[in-house]
Amino acid sequence: MQIGSRYGALLLAAVASVIAFASAAQSTSPALVWPNKARAAVSLAYDDALDSQLDIAVPALNRHGLKASFYLTLGSDTVRKRLVAWRRVASAGHELGNHTLFHQCSRSPPDRNWVTPDNDLDTISAAQLVAQIRLGNTLLQAIDGKQERTFAAPCGDLNASGEPYLEPLKGDFIAMKSAFGSVVPDMQTLDAYAVGVEVASDVTGDQLIALVRRAAAAGTMVNITFHGVGGDYLAVSRKAHEELLRYLASHRDIYWTDTFLRIMQYVKAQRVKDQPVSLRQTLQ
Protein backbone atom coordinates (compact mmCIF):
# COMPACT_ATOMS: atom_id res chain seq x y z
CA MET A 1 0.00 0.00 0.00
CA GLN A 2 2.81 2.36 0.90
CA ILE A 3 4.66 1.48 -2.31
CA GLY A 4 1.54 2.23 -4.37
CA SER A 5 0.99 5.52 -2.59
CA ARG A 6 4.64 6.48 -3.04
CA TYR A 7 4.47 5.57 -6.75
CA GLY A 8 1.29 7.59 -7.18
CA ALA A 9 2.85 10.59 -5.47
CA LEU A 10 5.92 10.37 -7.69
CA LEU A 11 3.74 10.11 -10.79
CA LEU A 12 1.70 13.13 -9.79
CA ALA A 13 4.87 15.08 -9.09
CA ALA A 14 6.25 14.15 -12.52
CA VAL A 15 3.07 15.22 -14.27
CA ALA A 16 3.02 18.48 -12.32
CA SER A 17 6.62 19.14 -13.33
CA VAL A 18 5.84 18.62 -17.01
CA ILE A 19 2.82 20.94 -16.81
CA ALA A 20 4.82 23.58 -14.95
CA PHE A 21 7.67 23.29 -17.44
CA ALA A 22 5.28 23.58 -20.38
CA SER A 23 3.59 26.62 -18.82
CA ALA A 24 6.92 28.28 -18.14
CA ALA A 25 8.10 27.57 -21.66
CA GLN A 26 4.90 29.02 -23.09
CA SER A 27 5.07 32.14 -20.96
CA THR A 28 8.66 32.80 -21.96
CA SER A 29 8.34 31.73 -25.61
CA PRO A 30 9.45 34.43 -28.04
CA ALA A 31 7.04 36.26 -30.30
CA LEU A 32 6.61 34.52 -33.61
CA VAL A 33 9.03 35.83 -36.23
CA TRP A 34 7.41 36.37 -39.63
CA PRO A 35 9.19 35.73 -42.95
CA ASN A 36 11.55 38.49 -44.10
CA LYS A 37 11.23 40.02 -40.62
CA ALA A 38 7.77 41.38 -41.39
CA ARG A 39 5.87 42.77 -38.42
CA ALA A 40 2.52 41.14 -39.21
CA ALA A 41 0.83 38.56 -41.39
CA VAL A 42 -2.24 39.53 -43.39
CA SER A 43 -4.76 36.99 -44.67
CA LEU A 44 -7.17 38.37 -47.24
CA ALA A 45 -10.12 36.05 -47.83
CA TYR A 46 -13.06 36.18 -50.21
CA ASP A 47 -16.12 34.08 -49.36
CA ASP A 48 -18.97 32.57 -51.39
CA ALA A 49 -17.40 32.41 -54.90
CA LEU A 50 -18.88 35.66 -56.26
CA ASP A 51 -18.59 37.13 -59.76
CA SER A 52 -17.15 40.41 -58.48
CA GLN A 53 -14.28 38.48 -56.92
CA LEU A 54 -13.29 37.05 -60.29
CA ASP A 55 -13.94 40.28 -62.17
CA ILE A 56 -12.49 42.85 -59.75
CA ALA A 57 -10.67 41.33 -56.77
CA VAL A 58 -8.51 38.75 -58.56
CA PRO A 59 -7.16 41.16 -61.23
CA ALA A 60 -6.38 43.71 -58.50
CA LEU A 61 -4.55 41.14 -56.36
CA ASN A 62 -2.55 39.92 -59.34
CA ARG A 63 -1.67 43.46 -60.36
CA HIS A 64 -0.22 44.12 -56.91
CA GLY A 65 1.44 40.71 -56.59
CA LEU A 66 -0.56 39.73 -53.50
CA LYS A 67 -1.90 36.25 -52.70
CA ALA A 68 -5.27 35.59 -51.10
CA SER A 69 -7.70 32.81 -50.17
CA PHE A 70 -11.02 32.22 -51.92
CA TYR A 71 -13.54 30.14 -49.99
CA LEU A 72 -15.81 28.56 -52.56
CA THR A 73 -19.43 27.62 -52.02
CA LEU A 74 -19.04 24.71 -54.38
CA GLY A 75 -22.69 24.34 -55.35
CA SER A 76 -22.93 27.95 -56.52
CA ASP A 77 -23.68 28.97 -60.11
CA THR A 78 -20.44 30.95 -60.25
CA VAL A 79 -18.38 27.83 -59.63
CA ARG A 80 -20.38 25.82 -62.15
CA LYS A 81 -20.37 28.45 -64.90
CA ARG A 82 -16.85 29.84 -64.37
CA LEU A 83 -14.90 26.76 -63.39
CA VAL A 84 -12.05 27.56 -65.79
CA ALA A 85 -11.69 31.02 -64.22
CA TRP A 86 -11.44 29.52 -60.73
CA ARG A 87 -8.81 27.11 -61.96
CA ARG A 88 -6.82 30.12 -63.22
CA VAL A 89 -7.15 31.71 -59.78
CA ALA A 90 -5.48 28.67 -58.24
CA SER A 91 -2.80 28.62 -60.96
CA ALA A 92 -1.95 32.23 -60.08
CA GLY A 93 -0.97 31.10 -56.56
CA HIS A 94 -4.15 31.91 -54.69
CA GLU A 95 -5.79 29.42 -52.34
CA LEU A 96 -9.13 27.77 -53.02
CA GLY A 97 -10.65 26.99 -49.64
CA ASN A 98 -13.68 24.98 -48.55
CA HIS A 99 -16.83 26.94 -47.69
CA THR A 100 -19.18 23.92 -47.90
CA LEU A 101 -21.26 22.80 -50.86
CA PHE A 102 -24.40 24.83 -50.17
CA HIS A 103 -23.48 27.48 -47.56
CA GLN A 104 -25.90 26.13 -44.95
CA CYS A 105 -26.48 28.49 -42.02
CA SER A 106 -28.79 28.38 -39.04
CA ARG A 107 -32.13 30.04 -39.83
CA SER A 108 -33.09 30.54 -36.19
CA PRO A 109 -31.08 33.69 -35.24
CA PRO A 110 -32.62 37.13 -35.87
CA ASP A 111 -32.16 38.58 -39.37
CA ARG A 112 -31.61 35.15 -40.92
CA ASN A 113 -34.76 35.08 -43.03
CA TRP A 114 -32.53 34.97 -46.09
CA VAL A 115 -31.58 31.38 -45.20
CA THR A 116 -33.88 29.11 -47.20
CA PRO A 117 -35.51 26.15 -45.43
CA ASP A 118 -33.57 23.66 -47.56
CA ASN A 119 -30.29 25.27 -46.48
CA ASP A 120 -31.16 25.53 -42.79
CA LEU A 121 -28.29 24.20 -40.69
CA ASP A 122 -30.78 23.39 -37.95
CA THR A 123 -32.34 20.67 -40.09
CA ILE A 124 -29.25 18.81 -41.30
CA SER A 125 -27.31 16.37 -39.16
CA ALA A 126 -23.68 16.96 -38.27
CA ALA A 127 -22.77 13.66 -39.95
CA GLN A 128 -24.40 14.79 -43.21
CA LEU A 129 -22.60 18.11 -43.14
CA VAL A 130 -19.24 16.48 -42.42
CA ALA A 131 -19.75 14.16 -45.40
CA GLN A 132 -20.63 17.12 -47.64
CA ILE A 133 -17.58 19.10 -46.53
CA ARG A 134 -15.31 16.15 -47.25
CA LEU A 135 -16.88 15.85 -50.68
CA GLY A 136 -16.11 19.54 -51.10
CA ASN A 137 -12.42 18.81 -50.57
CA THR A 138 -12.58 16.20 -53.32
CA LEU A 139 -14.20 18.69 -55.70
CA LEU A 140 -11.60 21.33 -54.85
CA GLN A 141 -8.81 18.86 -55.55
CA ALA A 142 -10.38 18.21 -58.94
CA ILE A 143 -10.16 21.96 -59.61
CA ASP A 144 -6.66 22.78 -58.35
CA GLY A 145 -4.95 19.41 -57.84
CA LYS A 146 -4.06 20.21 -54.23
CA GLN A 147 -4.67 18.15 -51.11
CA GLU A 148 -3.92 20.51 -48.20
CA ARG A 149 -6.81 22.80 -47.46
CA THR A 150 -8.34 25.29 -45.02
CA PHE A 151 -11.98 25.79 -44.11
CA ALA A 152 -14.21 28.78 -43.42
CA ALA A 153 -17.45 28.12 -41.53
CA PRO A 154 -20.46 29.79 -43.19
CA CYS A 155 -21.97 32.46 -40.94
CA GLY A 156 -19.57 31.34 -38.21
CA ASP A 157 -22.16 28.71 -37.22
CA LEU A 158 -20.56 25.73 -35.50
CA ASN A 159 -23.51 23.37 -34.95
CA ALA A 160 -25.71 21.31 -37.27
CA SER A 161 -29.03 20.33 -35.67
CA GLY A 162 -27.50 21.44 -32.38
CA GLU A 163 -24.45 19.17 -32.69
CA PRO A 164 -20.88 20.49 -33.20
CA TYR A 165 -19.55 19.47 -36.59
CA LEU A 166 -15.99 20.82 -36.75
CA GLU A 167 -14.22 18.36 -34.44
CA PRO A 168 -14.40 15.36 -36.83
CA LEU A 169 -13.00 17.57 -39.61
CA LYS A 170 -9.84 18.77 -37.91
CA GLY A 171 -7.80 16.02 -39.52
CA ASP A 172 -9.02 17.14 -42.95
CA PHE A 173 -7.79 20.73 -42.71
CA ILE A 174 -4.62 22.62 -41.82
CA ALA A 175 -6.66 25.35 -40.13
CA MET A 176 -10.18 26.78 -39.89
CA LYS A 177 -11.71 30.22 -39.80
CA SER A 178 -14.59 29.59 -37.43
CA ALA A 179 -14.79 32.63 -35.14
CA PHE A 180 -15.13 36.39 -35.30
CA GLY A 181 -12.41 38.84 -34.33
CA SER A 182 -9.90 41.01 -36.09
CA VAL A 183 -6.31 41.18 -34.86
CA VAL A 184 -4.99 37.99 -33.26
CA PRO A 185 -3.84 38.86 -29.71
CA ASP A 186 -1.21 36.10 -29.33
CA MET A 187 0.14 33.79 -32.04
CA GLN A 188 1.48 31.27 -29.53
CA THR A 189 -1.94 30.56 -28.04
CA LEU A 190 -3.96 30.88 -31.25
CA ASP A 191 -6.22 27.89 -31.86
CA ALA A 192 -5.63 26.99 -35.52
CA TYR A 193 -9.17 25.64 -35.72
CA ALA A 194 -10.90 28.68 -34.22
CA VAL A 195 -9.23 31.56 -36.03
CA GLY A 196 -11.24 34.77 -35.94
CA VAL A 197 -12.07 36.93 -38.94
CA GLU A 198 -13.04 40.54 -39.46
CA VAL A 199 -15.86 40.64 -42.02
CA ALA A 200 -15.38 43.79 -44.11
CA SER A 201 -18.53 45.37 -45.52
CA ASP A 202 -19.22 49.00 -46.42
CA VAL A 203 -15.92 50.22 -44.99
CA THR A 204 -13.38 52.71 -46.28
CA GLY A 205 -9.83 52.08 -47.35
CA ASP A 206 -8.63 53.99 -44.30
CA GLN A 207 -10.58 51.67 -42.00
CA LEU A 208 -9.09 48.60 -43.67
CA ILE A 209 -5.58 50.03 -43.45
CA ALA A 210 -6.14 50.80 -39.76
CA LEU A 211 -6.84 47.10 -39.19
CA VAL A 212 -3.56 45.93 -40.68
CA ARG A 213 -1.69 48.65 -38.80
CA ARG A 214 -3.10 47.27 -35.55
CA ALA A 215 -1.76 43.85 -36.49
CA ALA A 216 1.68 45.34 -37.12
CA ALA A 217 1.60 47.05 -33.73
CA ALA A 218 0.73 43.72 -32.09
CA GLY A 219 3.23 41.72 -34.15
CA THR A 220 0.57 39.13 -34.95
CA MET A 221 -1.87 38.66 -37.82
CA VAL A 222 -5.20 39.89 -39.11
CA ASN A 223 -7.78 37.97 -41.14
CA ILE A 224 -9.99 40.16 -43.31
CA THR A 225 -12.93 38.48 -45.03
CA PHE A 226 -14.59 40.08 -48.04
CA HIS A 227 -17.67 39.08 -49.97
CA GLY A 228 -18.58 41.40 -52.82
CA VAL A 229 -15.98 43.83 -54.16
CA GLY A 230 -17.53 46.68 -56.12
CA GLY A 231 -20.70 44.62 -56.51
CA ASP A 232 -22.71 41.64 -55.27
CA TYR A 233 -23.59 41.68 -51.53
CA LEU A 234 -21.91 42.59 -48.23
CA ALA A 235 -19.70 44.62 -50.53
CA VAL A 236 -16.78 46.94 -50.13
CA SER A 237 -16.17 49.49 -52.82
CA ARG A 238 -13.59 48.89 -55.52
CA LYS A 239 -11.85 52.05 -54.26
CA ALA A 240 -11.55 50.87 -50.64
CA HIS A 241 -10.30 47.47 -51.74
CA GLU A 242 -7.74 49.02 -54.07
CA GLU A 243 -6.47 51.37 -51.35
CA LEU A 244 -5.83 48.45 -49.01
CA LEU A 245 -4.02 46.43 -51.67
CA ARG A 246 -1.90 49.39 -52.69
CA TYR A 247 -0.94 49.99 -49.06
CA LEU A 248 0.01 46.34 -48.48
CA ALA A 249 2.00 46.17 -51.71
CA SER A 250 3.96 49.30 -50.85
CA HIS A 251 4.77 48.08 -47.33
CA ARG A 252 5.97 44.53 -47.95
CA ASP A 253 8.72 45.02 -45.39
CA ILE A 254 6.02 45.37 -42.71
CA TYR A 255 3.26 43.02 -43.91
CA TRP A 256 3.49 39.45 -45.11
CA THR A 257 0.34 39.05 -47.19
CA ASP A 258 -0.26 35.46 -48.21
CA THR A 259 -2.85 32.71 -48.33
CA PHE A 260 -4.33 31.53 -45.06
CA LEU A 261 -3.01 28.06 -45.85
CA ARG A 262 0.61 29.18 -46.17
CA ILE A 263 0.39 31.47 -43.15
CA MET A 264 -0.96 28.71 -40.91
CA GLN A 265 1.52 26.15 -42.24
CA TYR A 266 4.25 28.59 -41.23
CA VAL A 267 2.68 29.29 -37.82
CA LYS A 268 2.45 25.59 -37.00
CA ALA A 269 6.02 24.92 -38.12
CA GLN A 270 7.36 27.82 -36.06
CA ARG A 271 5.52 26.71 -32.94
CA VAL A 272 7.18 23.30 -33.08
CA LYS A 273 10.55 24.87 -33.84
CA ASP A 274 10.29 27.29 -30.90
CA GLN A 275 9.59 24.56 -28.32
CA PRO A 276 12.61 23.52 -26.23
CA VAL A 277 13.97 20.16 -27.36
CA SER A 278 13.42 18.64 -23.91
CA LEU A 279 9.77 19.75 -23.95
CA ARG A 280 9.22 18.34 -27.44
CA GLN A 281 10.65 14.99 -26.31
CA THR A 282 8.56 15.00 -23.14
CA LEU A 283 5.32 15.70 -25.00
CA GLN A 284 5.93 13.07 -27.70
Please identify what each model-predicted range represents.
Residues 28-36, 68, 78, 141, ...:
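C-terminal domain-boundary segment and adjacent tail
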Residues 48-52, 80, 123-131, 202, ...:
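Soluble non-cytosolic domains of exported or imported proteins
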Residues 40-42, 62-161, 171-172, 179-195, ...:
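Metal-dependent polysaccharide deacetylase catalytic core of the NodB/CE4 family, i.e.
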Residues 20-22:
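N-terminal signal peptide c-region/cleavage motif recognized by signal peptidases
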Residues 27-54, 198:
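Boundary/entry segment of secreted carbohydrate-active catalytic domains
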Residues 1-11:
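Bacterial N-terminal signal peptides that target proteins for export
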Residues 54, 58, 83-87, 130-137, ...:
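Generic structural signal for well-ordered alpha-helices
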Residues 46-49, 100, 228, 260:
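Active-site metal-binding loops of divalent metal-dependent hydrolases
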